[in-house]
Amino acid sequence: YYDNFTKGRYATDASIYQMMPHAVVIPKTYDDIVACLAFARDTGTPLLPRWGGTSQCGQTVNHAIVIDSTKHLNKIIELDAENRQCVVEPGIVLDELNRQLQPHGLWFPVDVSTSSRATIGGMAANNSCGGRSIRYGIMRDNVLAIDAWLADGSLASFGKLEQFPHPMNTL
């Protein structure tokens, strides 16, 4: 999207900063993200992954191509309730994740105050914490693995999660 209305919606977050992005991409698939990475690499345009926009420090605004994965890449891919593990897409909102985990007697313990809007991708990018962090830890203590696309378009795996065949698909 190149229109000023759409770009304006992504020019701010919960911080005091305002910066108009060059464009906004709302990917439907991971191939869309890879194509966006290639375009940015070929044109020298910066990219900015954006999730809930709940940061009060301005990490989600910049003069860049903003990629918003919250609209379509927001599901639980796999759930292993017995081992208390799941594979999720980066755009899933924390409250929605916990709503889907609750019938299995599970919940994700990192409890940010913006849980109705904060996404797992954004929480991972910021290593989020919350009021229960002293007991249950912060994001790095509760995430086993992340798969991420690098600027050259390659997929890198961080951590180890052999029992799940799917990547965590977190930028």
Stretches found by the model and what they are:
Residues 75-79, 86-171:
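FAD-binding subdomain of flavoenzyme oxidoreductases
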Residues 45-46, 107:
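Residue-level detector of anion-binding/catalytic polar loops
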Residues 41-43, 50-52, 118, 142:
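Short, basic and Ser/Thr-rich N-terminal targeting/leader segments
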Residues 47-49, 56, 97:
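Extended, hydrophobic alpha-helical segments in both membrane/secreted and soluble proteins
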Residues 1-42, 54-84, 113, 136:
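N-terminal flexible segment immediately upstream of the FAD-binding catalytic core
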